[in-house]
Design a protein with these regions (language model features):
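Solvent-exposed alpha-helix faces
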Residues: 78-82, 101, 137
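Short, intrinsically disordered, charge-balanced linker/junction segments flanking boundaries
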Residues: 133-139
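Conserved AMP-binding/adenylate-forming
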Residues: 66, 83-130
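Residue-level preference for short coil/turn positions at secondary-structure junctions
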Residues: 54-56, 92, 137
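Conserved N-terminal alpha-helix of the aminotransferase class I/II PLP-enzyme fold
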Residues: 59, 72-83
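AMP-dependent adenylate-forming
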Residues: 44-72
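Adenylate-forming
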Residues: 46-49, 73, 77, 96, ...
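Flexible, non-catalytic linker and terminal segments flanking ANL/adenylate-forming cores
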Residues: 1-40
Length: 139
Protein backbone atom coordinates (compact mmCIF):
# COMPACT_ATOMS: atom_id res chain seq x y z
CA UNK A 1 0.00 0.00 0.00
CA UNK A 2 1.28 3.46 -0.85
CA UNK A 3 0.30 6.48 1.20
CA UNK A 4 -1.35 9.33 -0.64
CA UNK A 5 0.02 12.85 -0.27
CA UNK A 6 -0.79 14.38 3.12
CA UNK A 7 -1.99 17.85 4.03
CA UNK A 8 -0.02 17.61 7.27
CA UNK A 9 2.81 20.10 7.57
CA UNK A 10 3.99 18.38 10.77
CA UNK A 11 4.78 14.85 9.58
CA UNK A 12 5.28 13.26 13.02
CA UNK A 13 2.41 10.80 12.67
CA UNK A 14 3.45 9.63 9.23
CA UNK A 15 7.10 9.42 10.25
CA UNK A 16 6.16 7.29 13.29
CA UNK A 17 4.27 4.63 11.31
CA UNK A 18 5.54 1.07 11.59
CA UNK A 19 7.39 -0.43 8.60
CA UNK A 20 5.13 -0.91 5.56
CA UNK A 21 5.32 -4.71 5.74
CA UNK A 22 3.46 -4.52 9.07
CA UNK A 23 0.55 -2.48 7.68
CA UNK A 24 -2.81 -4.18 7.21
CA UNK A 25 -4.12 -4.84 3.74
CA UNK A 26 -7.06 -2.54 3.08
CA UNK A 27 -9.30 -3.39 0.16
CA UNK A 28 -12.09 -0.98 -0.66
CA UNK A 29 -13.88 -3.02 -3.30
CA UNK A 30 -17.47 -2.48 -2.14
CA UNK A 31 -19.03 0.40 -4.13
CA UNK A 32 -20.68 1.89 -1.02
CA UNK A 33 -17.37 1.93 0.84
CA UNK A 34 -15.35 4.30 -1.29
CA UNK A 35 -13.42 7.20 0.17
CA UNK A 36 -11.94 10.31 -1.44
CA UNK A 37 -8.18 10.68 -1.73
CA UNK A 38 -8.24 13.16 1.16
CA UNK A 39 -10.87 13.21 3.92
CA UNK A 40 -11.37 15.50 6.92
CA UNK A 41 -13.56 13.73 9.48
CA UNK A 42 -14.88 16.98 11.00
CA UNK A 43 -15.95 18.28 7.60
CA UNK A 44 -17.71 14.99 6.87
CA UNK A 45 -19.40 14.79 10.28
CA UNK A 46 -20.44 18.43 10.53
CA UNK A 47 -20.45 20.28 7.22
CA UNK A 48 -21.74 17.38 5.11
CA UNK A 49 -24.50 16.72 7.65
CA UNK A 50 -25.54 20.38 7.36
CA UNK A 51 -25.43 20.11 3.56
CA UNK A 52 -27.71 17.06 3.64
CA UNK A 53 -30.15 17.90 6.43
CA UNK A 54 -29.89 21.62 7.17
CA UNK A 55 -28.18 23.71 9.83
CA UNK A 56 -31.14 24.21 12.15
CA UNK A 57 -31.52 20.62 13.31
CA UNK A 58 -30.38 19.86 16.86
CA UNK A 59 -26.79 18.63 17.03
CA UNK A 60 -26.26 18.51 20.80
CA UNK A 61 -28.96 17.99 23.43
CA UNK A 62 -28.10 18.28 27.12
CA UNK A 63 -29.93 16.84 30.12
CA UNK A 64 -30.82 20.35 31.35
CA UNK A 65 -32.73 21.03 28.12
CA UNK A 66 -30.00 23.10 26.48
CA UNK A 67 -29.54 22.35 22.81
CA UNK A 68 -27.20 23.52 20.08
CA UNK A 69 -28.16 23.42 16.44
CA UNK A 70 -25.70 22.26 13.81
CA UNK A 71 -25.30 25.94 12.87
CA UNK A 72 -24.31 26.85 16.46
CA UNK A 73 -22.02 23.85 16.75
CA UNK A 74 -20.29 24.64 13.46
CA UNK A 75 -19.76 28.28 14.49
CA UNK A 76 -18.07 27.16 17.71
CA UNK A 77 -16.03 24.48 15.94
CA UNK A 78 -14.83 26.92 13.28
CA UNK A 79 -13.93 29.49 15.94
CA UNK A 80 -11.89 26.92 17.88
CA UNK A 81 -10.13 25.80 14.68
CA UNK A 82 -9.31 29.43 13.94
CA UNK A 83 -7.86 29.96 17.45
CA UNK A 84 -5.63 26.90 17.02
CA UNK A 85 -4.27 28.00 13.65
CA UNK A 86 -4.31 31.80 13.71
CA UNK A 87 -3.83 32.63 17.39
CA UNK A 88 -1.70 29.68 18.50
CA UNK A 89 0.10 29.09 15.19
CA UNK A 90 -0.55 25.35 15.00
CA UNK A 91 -0.28 23.69 11.60
CA UNK A 92 -1.92 20.58 10.13
CA UNK A 93 -0.36 17.48 11.60
CA UNK A 94 0.44 19.02 14.99
CA UNK A 95 -0.75 16.95 17.91
CA UNK A 96 -3.32 18.38 20.32
CA UNK A 97 -3.90 16.69 23.66
CA UNK A 98 -7.47 17.00 24.96
CA UNK A 99 -8.08 16.30 28.63
CA UNK A 100 -11.67 17.24 29.38
CA UNK A 101 -14.83 15.88 30.90
CA UNK A 102 -17.32 14.60 28.36
CA UNK A 103 -19.54 17.46 27.32
CA UNK A 104 -20.45 19.79 24.46
CA UNK A 105 -17.17 21.71 24.65
CA UNK A 106 -15.27 18.45 24.28
CA UNK A 107 -17.13 17.93 21.01
CA UNK A 108 -16.27 21.49 19.93
CA UNK A 109 -12.58 21.05 20.73
CA UNK A 110 -12.33 17.60 19.13
CA UNK A 111 -14.10 18.60 15.91
CA UNK A 112 -12.32 21.98 15.78
CA UNK A 113 -8.91 20.38 16.11
CA UNK A 114 -9.76 17.81 13.43
CA UNK A 115 -11.15 20.49 11.12
CA UNK A 116 -7.89 22.44 11.48
CA UNK A 117 -5.98 19.31 10.47
CA UNK A 118 -4.61 18.46 13.90
CA UNK A 119 -4.05 14.98 15.27
CA UNK A 120 -6.22 14.74 18.38
CA UNK A 121 -5.01 12.73 21.36
CA UNK A 122 -7.72 12.34 24.00
CA UNK A 123 -7.01 11.31 27.57
CA UNK A 124 -9.13 10.58 30.62
CA UNK A 125 -9.41 13.33 33.23
CA UNK A 126 -8.94 10.71 35.97
CA UNK A 127 -5.36 10.04 34.88
CA UNK A 128 -2.66 11.40 37.15
CA UNK A 129 0.66 12.93 36.17
CA UNK A 130 2.49 9.59 36.04
CA UNK A 131 -0.09 8.25 33.57
CA UNK A 132 -0.17 11.41 31.46
CA UNK A 133 3.58 12.02 31.33
CA UNK A 134 4.50 9.35 28.74
CA UNK A 135 1.67 10.46 26.47
CA UNK A 136 2.34 14.18 26.84
CA UNK A 137 6.03 13.65 26.09
CA UNK A 138 5.12 12.06 22.74
CA UNK A 139 2.43 14.59 21.87
Amino acid sequence: MTLSPSAHVDTFTRDALPPAHLWPTLEFTIPDVQYPERLNAAVELLDRTIDRFGADRPAILLADGTSWSYRELRARVDQFAQVLTEDLGLVPGNRVLLRMLNGPWTVVCWLGALKAGMVVVTTMVAWRARELRPIAERV
